Amino acid sequence: MDLLVYLPLLACSLLLFPVMLTVGREIAADACASEISGFQHLNSTGLHLTLHHPQSPCSPAPLSKDLPFSAVIAHDAARITRLTTNNPSRRPTSLHRGNKPVSNQVDDSLAVTVPLTPGASVGVGNYVTRLGLGTPTTSYAMVVDTGSSLTWLQCSPCIVSCHRQTGQLYDPQASSTYASVPCSSAQCSELQAATFNPSACSKSNICIYQASYGDGSFSIGYLSKDTVSLGGSSFPGFVYGCGQDNEGLFGQSAGLIGLARNKLSLLYQLAPSIGSSFSYCLPTSASAGYLSIGSYNPGQYLYTPMVSSSLDTSLYFINIAGMSVGGNPLAVSSSEYSSLPTIIDSGTVISRLPTAVYTALSKALVAAMGGTPHAPAYSILDTCFKGQVSKLHLPALDLAFAGGATLKLKPGNVLIDVDDSTTCLAFAATDDTAIIGNTQQQTFSVIYDVAQSRIGFAAGGCS
């Protein structure tokens, strides 16, 4: 019998139904137990999952609060490299081990690897939730990622390597609904578009995937199917990656849930049952948010159109229309806002703006903050102040998008504490691709309505 039949089936069925669990802003560590009891529920609009900040004490896969902010900067750099180079013309056409090509016909020992460079492109700036998978169902702590398509997680027996994770590995032998995906399947053919890496085929005709990231982190394993069960409902045949060689810094998560625009993403696979929209509220480390898949209340949002880009059709692009500080528009031509394509992303921490826009924003903020003492630059963050954001008085800052949607940013959406005595503007300049990251999205409800090709924003989403 093929080895794959025995591999863990951890399908990241993270998004299953519309999710809208709300939690109080301040969550003490001793309140986490009661929060877990309401982790997921099903109502008339679908399933609601709790979403955690990576450094929340209630996170199922928490990161150390002692993690230096330089690690976040490194994570962002690697992630942006991946997001902005996910183009078939820029990627290899065969699996590689280091710089040596590997045959696309491999044996069941999964002797296909890539460089073992430790990475930080998953699990530092991303948000975490739990998913149920298999029959009987077991739940796993998973990173939520709008910039990835394929859902994957670590599977027993970890033929090559697995990083340390919270909880046990998924064992496919324990699931009566597990199945491997053959090389001749349509899902195997879709891997190139989903991962920008080609698939391989085992000698027993099992499809092998490779998901790689900008800093050398990767997951390689068998493409698999199993049942995702959440909120009392089950979805059979969910396709995901069962990782047997997982290298890099993925925190303590079991794997990653892909929410990008591709046939293999969780959203697209579940769309026939629950609809092609999802929403979330990204919480601060002191609160909890939610992830929701399915129907939603359209009246609570202000919308901006999704736009297409040749950079990567699986990512979510929008257009920035303007910015203002203290009610005054930035001193920059309106054409500068649309000079670069703009991605909205759940995993990038520091947003990137076209250089002219960033320069105008920095000058306007410094002028508006008057005598606030300046601090030295921190890595790429060159507009810094002494103190912490909670102690400073900031002017109103609005971020407007095409179509009329506007984010009225709070201080914590504008500045980010990099250490105990320094806070910096949570934007940086770029001449490549602009990105609206998760710092600016925190505490807002954000809806991705793929069916109507629009993204909506509403204030107070996590409260």
Which stretches of residues belong to each language-model region?
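Aspartic protease catalytic domain
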Residues: 2-63, 70, 134-136, 144-149, ...
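Extended, H/D-rich, highly charged conserved domains that either
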Residues: 261-264, 272-296
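Aspartyl protease catalytic core from the pepsin/retropepsin fold
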Residues: 129-139, 181-266, 321-323, 327-332, ...
